[in-house]
């Protein structure tokens, strides 16, 4: 098993891209801005506290089993606050939406939503 911060499967292209000075600096600035501002939440638990506001909206929570950025516990806590959402855990994935398992679940969810009236 190879685990990186962004994904479960080693991606040579991603490593090369993150190693480019211009991209690395831009990404670091965005990440720092996000974290310095507390993710732009009014409290660390805002998402869970306000989940009741979206309980009437169909949703899918796609979570990589080996996500070290947003641990599995985060998805479980959100699902407990929003039980109507479909929680899908991808066994061989981390955090990146580009990982095959995550990507296929996101596309499937999008296809399901396309059929809603």
Residue ranges, per PLM feature:
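Alpha/beta-hydrolase
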Residues: 1-50, 57
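Hydrophobic, well-ordered secondary-structure elements that form the walls
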Residues: 31, 67, 78
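Short, conserved loop/helix-junction motifs that constitute active-site signature segments
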Residues: 52-56, 81-82
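Short beta-strand/loop motif that positions the catalytic acidic residue
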Residues: 54-55, 61-63
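Short, glycine-/Ser/Thr-/acidic-enriched flexible segments
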Residues: 66-67, 94
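Conserved alpha/beta-hydrolase "acid-adjacent" motif
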Residues: 68-74
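Catalytic active-site module of serine/aspartate enzymes centered on a nucleophile-bearing elbow/loop
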Residues: 85-117
């Amino acid at each position: 098993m190879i685990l990186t911060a962004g994904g479960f499967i080693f991606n040579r292209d991603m490593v090369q891209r993150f190693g480019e000075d211009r991209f690395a600096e831009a990404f670091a600035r965005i990440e720092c801005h996000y974290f310095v501002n507390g993710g732009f939440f009014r409290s660390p638990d805002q998402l869970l506290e306000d989940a009741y506001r979206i309980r009437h909206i169909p949703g899918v929570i796609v979570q990589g089993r080996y996500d070290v950025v947003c641990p599995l516990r985060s998805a479980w806590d959100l699902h407990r606050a929003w039980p109507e959402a479909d929680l899908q855990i991808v066994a061989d994935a981390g955090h990146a939406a580009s990982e095959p398992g995550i990507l296929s679940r996101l596309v499937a969810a999008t296809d399901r939503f396309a059929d809603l009236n």
